[in-house]
Amino acid sequence: MMNLRDIDAGDPSKYRLIGRSVLSYKFIAPYDSALYIGQIKKITDTTKNVTFFAKITDLSHDSNFADSRWDTRVYAEEFYGLGEDVFLAVDAVPLGYVENSGGAFHKPRTIPSKFSLVDDPDGEDFSFLTDLMGEIEVGLMRSGQDVIRDVAVCIPSRILPQHMGVFATTGMGKSNFMRVFCASCMKERKFGLLVVDPH
């Protein structure tokens, strides 16, 4: 009978990059982690002194057991249990990286070091975006099921003197987008605005 130590979810070593390529990252997480498609993760590479960002694209159950059908056995839970050898395998697409020294953002043309720490970003991690964004707010940054409240998504007013379309199916947030967008445009007072909302 196997006795496995239960996962210490507070141990950051459980969230670590295990590989793939410069085009696709893979990391593991405890089996009971609440992860979602579209969630943005921060990958801290202390070897290269950079912070990578990636968006989750797939989640699957995985284990370290040699028996690939261990979880279909009648007494699987009794013999194997859910511990540190059972985990979630997470696939993610790279978004880019920021140099910790200078703060410059780069396209993902390199790969994080193996076993780099994977964590949730906070508003401060996205501070580099404030230099890249404009002054017209259109909403807040989303990460999976959550909103990163400290990170407003803004577009530069210089690109607005032209026609713009907002297209989506019902319930996708068009009206909310237009509400925030119009309020931000009125606050800036740099141009006129005509909104057509056909039904």
Predicted regions and their residues:
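P-loop NTP-binding catalytic core
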Residues: 100-158, 163
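Glycine-rich phosphate-binding loop of nucleotide-binding enzymes
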Residues: 137-199
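Long, basic/Gly/Ser/Thr-rich N-terminal segments
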Residues: 1-128
